[in-house]
């Protein structure tokens, strides 16, 4: 037990220094303790403690179910009192199951929620979107935060939360019900939309195709799909690009579901927040390639947001010291609009 306490203290030191060698040494010792505890009855009580330290090193991804309340403010200055929040959303993050990564709240979600609320709060009333579609909603934080804030500004505001995985959809509906939100939960398969939008069949194979489930019709029947003719003022997507093909699929979804510019709503937009991870640079590059100036949609603005993400272990962070609140992370906020000379532009 004293050994576990010492290792827990070392885990805190490794977390602060982000020392990969130290962290690996700790994992080796902890795995040996777990193995020893599993084979020696007198040391069985070591298993739980050693395992808890391993979870601590693994970060949020290894945690079980938990509830967390997020508060959003119009001013960036801290500290703040929760009573000053213009929106607050309680979210349940479920335990990771298989490929259902969206069941956890990734670090990009609260940053995109805050940015959009602050942006719309400083805009003219006629710019406020009436219909919002969230892609790859995951735990639903972005859509639910917008639904709460927009609902207080205009009574006709409506937010639709979408995802693909059955486990994620079940948790998404749970969060929507817990927040007493008027947001709808729907199933949406980006790849199916992409294929429907193609004039010729294209054969390709991606990692996502190998890992994602194939019960699309089942989940559409259970949760309802998004009508192919539905159009929205704004589309939002936080940390949804984890395969280079996804940007292409999202482009197809935007072509189908993003409102064309009109006099009443001249600037429909797709907002994407993409974390810059050294393991996913190809995915980031795909966004620039797909939404280039030659596309019907193009990137109108790019903003950099600095923040923290405690989803993974310290090894996923940069070489800078790791803050207690998570791994430092840089996100790119893409504001994507219809190209003015696009044939799709109204």
Task: Show which residues each predicted segment covers.
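S-adenosylmethionine-dependent methyltransferases
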Residues: 1-346
């Amino acid at each position: 037990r004293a050994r576990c306490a010492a290792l827990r203290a070392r885990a805190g030191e490794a977390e602060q220094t982000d020392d990969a060698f130290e962290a690996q040494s700790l994992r080796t010792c902890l795995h040996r303790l777990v193995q020893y505890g599993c084979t020696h009855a007198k040391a069985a009580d070591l298993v739980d403690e050693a395992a808890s330290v391993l979870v601590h090193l693994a970060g949020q991804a290894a945690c079980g179910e938990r509830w967390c309340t997020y508060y959003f403010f119009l001013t960036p200055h801290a500290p703040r009192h929760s009573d000053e929040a213009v929106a607050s959303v309680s979210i349940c993050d479920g335990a990771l199951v298989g490929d259902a990564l969206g069941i956890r709240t990734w670090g990009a979600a609260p940053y995109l929620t805050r940015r959009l609320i602050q942006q719309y709060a400083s805009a003219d009333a006629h710019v406020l979107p009436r219909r919002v579609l969230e892609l790859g909603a995951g735990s639903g934080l972005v859509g639910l935060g917008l639904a709460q804030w927009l609902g207080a500004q205009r009574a006709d505001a409506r937010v639709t939360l979408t995802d693909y995985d059955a486990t994620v959809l079940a948790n998404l509906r749970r969060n929507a019900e817990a927040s007493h939100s008027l947001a709808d939960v729907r199933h949406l398969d980006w790849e199916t939309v992409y294929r429907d939008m193609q004039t010729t069949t294209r054969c390709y194979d991606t990692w996502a195709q190998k890992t994602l489930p194939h019960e699309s019709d089942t989940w559409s029947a259970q949760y309802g799909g998004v009508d192919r003719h539905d159009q929205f003022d704004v589309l939002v997507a936080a940390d949804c690009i984890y395969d280079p093909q996804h940007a292409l699929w999202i482009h197809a979804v935007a072509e189908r579901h993003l409102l064309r510019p009109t006099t009443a709503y001249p600037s429909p937009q797709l907002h994407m927040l993409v974390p810059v991870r050294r393991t996913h640079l190809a995915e980031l590059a795909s966004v620039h390639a797909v939404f280039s100036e030659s596309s019907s949609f193009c990137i109108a603005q790019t903003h950099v947001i600095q923040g923290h993400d405690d989803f993974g272990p310290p090894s996923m962070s940069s070489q800078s010291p790791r803050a207690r609140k998570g791994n430092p992370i840089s996100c790119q906020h893409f504001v994507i609009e219809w190209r003015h000379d696009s044939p799709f532009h109204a």
